């Protein structure tokens, strides 16, 4: 079992080329697993964690409802935002500057074969990261992701999640709002959930800007511990 996760920080990169890159890495792992099984080999499979910041883009999961996008094509263009219907779980979400997007592309057979546990550990890494900033966050029953003010009328989402898995290989991942322009969420019903707000780390801390590299290092620390991995 290979518990090393290769970290790649892609910086600012458009959604489409990043999605294609994810698919390449994902398919390479799947292909090697098929080869291992067919030829009775035991070649180690790779694991990756991609960090990226996307230009303005809305993405809709495979079970999502297009009605949760409140803009037409011309309005999207006017906002300089792209739109993609993609192959992850979940509904609609927004990605943009000031948001830390993480795509773990893992062979879960290197760790554990349990998608539910995988999602809960991704959430836990965010909960622990936010706790380091003095914020109490948690899960909202039946709604994947991480929230503040759970169980109150002021529940607000700070981290969205949506993944795809096949043959125990994962792709897509999480999006943590750090210094993001929350106005872009007004153009969607985030994750198809009505009546709940969206927030970001800088808003919750009452500061203009949070150091995103510092946040990433905390996420890496917690993922390393939770997955008993080595992130290199």
Swiss-Prot record:
**Domain BPL/LPL catalytic, residue spans:** 43-231
Reactions catalysed: octanoyl-[ACP] + L-lysyl-[protein] = N(6)-octanoyl-L-lysyl-[protein] + holo-[ACP] + H(+)
A single GO molecular-function term is: lipoyl(octanoyl) transferase activity
Identify the PROSITE patterns for this entry: BPL_LPL_CATALYTIC, LIPB
Q: Does the keyword Transferase apply?
A: yes
Q: Which UniProt keywords apply?
A: Acyltransferase, Cytoplasm, Transferase
Point out the signal peptide segment. Answer: none
Q: One of this protein's GO BP terms?
A: protein modification process
Record has Oxidoreductase as a keyword = no
Localization of this protein: Cytoplasm
Q: Quote the EC number.
A: 2.3.1.181
Q: In which pathway does it act?
A: Protein modification; protein lipoylation via endogenous pathway; protein N(6)-(lipoyl)lysine from octanoyl-[acyl-carrier-protein]: step 1/2
Per its UniProt record, what SUPFAM superfamilies does this chain match? Class II aaRS and biotin synthetases (SSF55681)
User: Which sites bind substrate?
Assistant: 88-95, 160-162, 173-175
Highest taxon of source: Bacteria
Where are the catalytic residues? 191
Main localization is cytoplasm
Q: Further notes on this entry? A: In the reaction, the free carboxyl group of octanoic acid is attached via an amide linkage to the epsilon-amino group of a specific lysine residue of lipoyl domains of lipoate-dependent enzymes.
> What does the protein in this record do?
Catalyzes the transfer of endogenously produced octanoic acid from octanoyl-acyl-carrier-protein onto the lipoyl domains of lipoate-dependent enzymes. Lipoyl-ACP can also act as a substrate although octanoyl-ACP is likely to be the physiological substrate.
Name assigned to this protein? Octanoyltransferase
What gene name is listed for this protein?
lipB
